[in-house]
């Protein structure tokens, strides 16, 4: 789990 993944998940 990375910061980039966190951002992408939040945008889903």
UniProtKB/Swiss-Prot annotation:
Nacreous layer of shell. This is Uncharacterized protein IMPP9. It comes from the Eukaryota.
């Amino acid at each position: 789990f990375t910061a980039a993944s966190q951002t992408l998940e939040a945008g889903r």
